[in-house]
Regions:
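Positively charged, small/polar-rich N-terminal and surface patches that mediate targeting and assembly
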Residues: 1-91
Length: 91
């Protein structure tokens, strides 16, 4: 079974926790960890932005990544949420 870490950013801890809980309840993720705060620097609509954000890391199977990503897109407050799958090697 291939497993992945899913890296997701959110605007605040409340939203990150809500997303993590939803993913675990729906069995899209086995576990979710919320890490706070981080500073994100990115380009949006032609301008450099700098914001405080929260990172959610979800642990899941590779075959659930597409469904998990679609669910995050449905419930996330961002127009274009960051959802990145990283394969787990070892552990």
């Amino acid at each position: 079974m291939e497993t992945c870490l899913i890296y997701i950013t959110a605007p605040n801890a409340e939203e990150a926790v809500a997303i993590g809980r939803d993913l675990v309840e729906r069995e899209f993720a086995a576990c979710a960890n919320v890490h706070s705060p981080i500073v994100s620097i990115y380009r949006w609509e032609g301008a450099i932005q700098e914001d405080s954000e929260v990172v959610l890391i979800a642990k899941t199977r590779r075959d659930l990544v597409d469904e998990l990503s679609a669910r995050v897109a449905d419930i996330h407050s961002y127009d274009c949420p960051c959802v990145v799958a990283l394969p787990i090697e070892g552990g």
